[in-house]
């Protein structure tokens, strides 16, 4: 999606927010059409908790196959909007580049915004309650289904931004079978496990450690 938007708009700065919006809409549809249906039919049993995980992994395979069918399996290039050459301090060039700085500031900004939403707003309270104790949340009057959809939309927007920024910050090359695509998924999951699957700051700390 990010590649297509960059190609059509010719402007990375326009493509980035559009990718986030489309990522949010796509994730919301996945939750409504797939995850919600699975949860309704698999609320009990030893594998109930991992059914959504298995489903999303299957969906990932379908998406990768679809990408290959539409755009082919050849590598496609996305040009970075900023220089990837490190800043110069005197005669020395440091490892931090303008592109690195953009990614760093974006991550910090997103963590602060999401942290505020989760900790300081009624929406955040509803999101946490729906995740930890959906039955109790529903008894308290929270529309768990709608809140879960909002949570997926937020995750989709953040994921779209992360994918597009990491692509241009890395090799700039993306394809369904690219190593960078696989590493992004693998390291993202490992970072979440290291930092705690229920902790946003912990997940960021896990990513920094990696």
Regions found by a protein language model. Name each.
Residues 3, 20-26, 57-66, 106-115, ...:
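Hydrophobic core segments of alpha-helical transmembrane domains in multi-pass membrane transport
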């Amino acid at each position: 999606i990010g590649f297509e938007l960059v190609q059509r708009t010719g402007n990375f700065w326009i493509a980035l927010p559009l990718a986030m919006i489309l990522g949010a809409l796509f994730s919301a549809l996945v939750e409504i059409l797939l995850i919600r249906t699975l949860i309704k039919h698999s609320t009990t049993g030893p594998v109930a908790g991992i059914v959504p995980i298995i489903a999303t992994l299957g969906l990932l395979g379908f998406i990768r196959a679809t990408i290959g069918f539409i755009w082919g399996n050849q590598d496609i290039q996305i040009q970075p909007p900023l220089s990837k050459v490190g800043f110069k301090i005197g005669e020395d060039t440091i490892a931090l580049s303008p592109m690195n700085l953009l990614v760093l500031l974006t991550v910090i900004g997103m963590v602060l915004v999401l942290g505020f939403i989760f900790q300081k707003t009624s929406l955040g309270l509803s999101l946490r309650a729906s995740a930890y104790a959906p039955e109790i949340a529903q008894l308290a009057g929270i529309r768990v289904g709608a809140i879960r959809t909002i949570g997926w939309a937020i995750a989709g927007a953040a994921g779209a931004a992360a994918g597009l920024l990491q692509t241009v910050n890395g090799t700039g090359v993306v394809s369904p079978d690219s190593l960078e695509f696989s590493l992004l998924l693998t390291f993202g999951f490992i970072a979440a496990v290291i930092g705690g699957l229920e902790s946003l700051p912990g997940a960021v700390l896990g990513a920094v450690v990696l």
